[in-house]
Amino acid sequence: MNEFDRVRDYLTDLQDRICAAVEAADGKARFAEDLWKREEGGGGRTRILRDGAVFEQAGIGFSDVSGTRLPPSASAHRPELAGATWRACGVSLVFHPHNPYIPTTHMNVRYFRAERDGEVVAAWFGGGFDLTPFYPFDEDVQHWHRVAQALCEPFGQERYAAHKRWCDEYFFLRHRNETRGVGGLFFDDLGQDFERDFAYQRAVGDGFLDAYIPIVQRRKDTPYGEREREFQLYRRGRYVEFNLVYDRGTLFGLQSGGRAESILMSLPPRVRWEYGFTPEPGSAEARLADYLIPRDWLG
């Protein structure tokens, strides 16, 4: 089996396993599957769970797509690849819970290959996971980062620190001067050693459930009211802002003629904006700002 097919098989299995775990955690709703084809090449399967007991919407998509010309979002930082044919596969998910005390989360793992005249000229892995709480708890954030640190350990002492820092820098809303959440891991252009890099991608993909599901179980029965729900919807607006303004995956998908429904499944089903909103000083809502700056959660 060639390298691309090995990654592809892992990713389809990962999607299956995460769907099963989320359905078990939700206890009510099930994923609906949408199989799709891309005219330019490839296709995928998008799965959406809606209106569950725990999750308002949970989307997880697998795609395997190809093209004859790299879009600007992909070739901007690799100009030598302009005009190359390409193929990419990945799994991407975003989960939006009902309960404002359960954080929203995102995970993505992907593999990209570019060819010219039948020869592979570049291939790399990318991905990571990050957590976006609305009412954060130190124990949840520390658990999230402990899992991230542990899965990085076999790949060198600096791996966690480097990819945590990359995550903090990537998921940053410059126009708001705040991070999207409390971070996690982010990596891209990892293509020096296929076996080692593929092992790391698997560690990130497999570690996601260990990082997230315990937080869901801990917070899913926390009582909340209209105030918390309104704040959750307001903060979801920042999620939308990041995805539509900064996210490279969203831009790549749209610029490459990708399937808009699948690309935009990351957006929350309900969201609101409020001009000039300022949380009451000393409130739980105001406390969130203390978490939206890069910091060492395990120190």
From Swiss-Prot:
E.C. numbers: 1.3.3.3
UniProt GO cellular component terms: cytoplasm
Domain of life: Bacteria
Entry-linked InterPro entries: Coprogen_oxidase_aer, Coprogen_oxidase_aer_sf, Coprogen_oxidase_CS
EC main group: oxidoreductase
Short name of any one Pfam family annotated for the protein: Coprogen_oxidas
Residues annotated as catalytic: 106 (proton donor)
Important for dimerization, as annotated region: 239-274
The keyword Kinase is assigned to this record: no
GO molecular function term, any single one: metal ion binding
Keywords annotated in UniProt: Cytoplasm, Heme biosynthesis, Metal-binding, Oxidoreductase, Porphyrin biosynthesis
Cofactor(s) needed: a divalent metal cation
Positions contributing to a divalent metal cation binding: 96, 106, 145, 175
Catalytic activity entry: coproporphyrinogen III + O2 + 2 H(+) = protoporphyrinogen IX + 2 CO2 + 2 H2O
Family: Belongs to the aerobic coproporphyrinogen-III oxidase family.
Protein name: Oxygen-dependent coproporphyrinogen-III oxidase
Species the sequence originates in: Xanthomonas euvesicatoria pv. vesicatoria (strain 85-10) (Xanthomonas campestris pv. vesicatoria)
